[in-house]
Amino acid sequence: MRCILGTKKSMTQIFREDGTVVPVTRVQAGPCVVTQVKTAKRDGVSAVQVGFGPQKAFRLTKPLKGHLKDLDAVRHMRDFRAPENHGLSRGDSFTVSIFSAGDRVQVAGVSKGKGFQGVVKRHGFSGGPASHGHKDQLRMPGSIGSADPARVFKGMRMGGHMGDQQVTVKNLEILAIDEEKNELLVKGAVPGARGGLLMISTEDGKIDVSTGADETKAEVVIEDQSEDVSIPEEKTASEEEAVTA
């Protein structure tokens, strides 16, 4: 299981070596940190909670501050189902390097909200006839039930709120990875608007955080060594007499 959180940036196109044009979506993914590890025995489900995106500490509620007390504040947190032997622990961080070009992933996001829409746009109805004595019937749904039950059955397709729902697109191919910019180039379109949160995952492979953990520890050591703490030297008795004289 490999998973990461990201945001949708834009769509563009790239050219393959054979000259074919491929539409791609740029996704700003990671770096992410593991904020909680859930087990089936304690929590009823085996999952990993992943945090993404910087957040100011004063914007966190008290429960979130307690939940992230030993970690940096994050803006988004999502759970991913994982097997019991995933090997991750709280505080582990990882980037887009967990994926490689050619991987097949599924991308979940919230689709664009369209507001209240009629049946023609929402469900693809053809509408009524536009001539031969019909008036104001072009986009009407038509009959919604017969007279015998004298009621409308549940699930009848009618006008209503369209969009703004979680949509998952499966079997998308990762064409390229930019580790310096933390970007993924995913073939095709992904749900949601620009800046929307995306959950990218695949059941294949395993997240290896050993390299990232070593680099983090090395950075901390360097920062500690760079601190210059100056301690004033104690003056001897002869020096103090010379100063008073």
Model-derived segments and spans:
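Extended basic (Lys/Arg/His-rich) segments that typically form rRNA-contacting surfaces
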Residues: 1-245
